[in-house]
Amino acid sequence: MNSFRFTKMHGLGNSYIYVNQFEEHLPEELLSDLAVKVSSVYTGIGSDGMILICPSDRAPVKMRIFNSDGSEGKNCGNGLRCVAKYAYEHKLVEETSFLIETLSGLVKAQVEVDEGKVVSATVDMGEPRLLKSDMPMRGEQGSETINEKMIFGGREMKGTAVSMGNPHIVFYLDDIEKAPLTTMGPLIEKDERFPEGVNVEFVEVENENELHFRVWERGSGITQACGTGACAAAVSSVLNGYSKRDTDITVHLAGGDLIINWKNDGRVMMTGPAETVCEGEFFIS
């Protein structure tokens, strides 16, 4: 294989290179290295990683996500919306509501269509998991981490841990523009308390229905948006008394807005845009 076709898509600036494995059949042994190569802004296409849209025995399509460092992730909210858009527009599915298989399980997606094009997608992100063992996170495995004091690099911080199929730790501050992403993000991501690493979110509460959000993503660093992170931020804000259940919460990310609702039945719904940037052919060197 000397080349493959790709589609670059983004959800609020969180961009990935999407590959249709129904047609391309990239070999397993190349996936990690290819993710690193295509993600490079210097020698590749430029993205936060690579997402494969694959056949599935359990759903119409399966999503596999590889971060820009080559590691494989379990879930990606922005990626799910883009996969939903791609699957519908490329006729991999016929209905506007369908399932997507991920490493975290089956996810239900609903697309909003205008003149044959998907303009937004709502994804059922499932139920948040709050125990340390769910993250995983070192400590008392049967306990939750809500507004818990922690020390990172000599700095005391209060964090809330939420798993949305991948691990998140949420911190609150008064001014989102002062979020210490470059200093604290990589330090916390690789802290020994999180044996598999962690996504790091900083949140400023505007009011009970609006949050300002910045993220350091595990395996990718600073990104414009993180769908599972926005879900974790909304769940954390309910747990800490800033927001309410069964209410639309607008999360303002660097790349735009997502609507998150932690329903009374326990499931978290995420609504937002998905856009195609370009299509092309990538040559493997």
Curated annotation (Swiss-Prot):
The active site is at residues 76, 226. It catalyses: (2S,6S)-2,6-diaminopimelate = meso-2,6-diaminopimelate. Keywords: Amino-acid biosynthesis, Cytoplasm, Isomerase, Lysine biosynthesis. It is found in: Cytoplasm. Pathway: Amino-acid biosynthesis; L-lysine biosynthesis via DAP pathway; DL-2,6-diaminopimelate from LL-2,6-diaminopimelate: step 1/1. One of its GO terms (molecular function) is diaminopimelate epimerase activity. The keyword tRNA-binding does not apply. NCBIfam families: DapF. Catalyzes the stereoinversion of LL-2,6-diaminopimelate (L,L-DAP) to meso-diaminopimelate (meso-DAP), a precursor of L-lysine and an essential component of the bacterial peptidoglycan. This is Diaminopimelate epimerase.
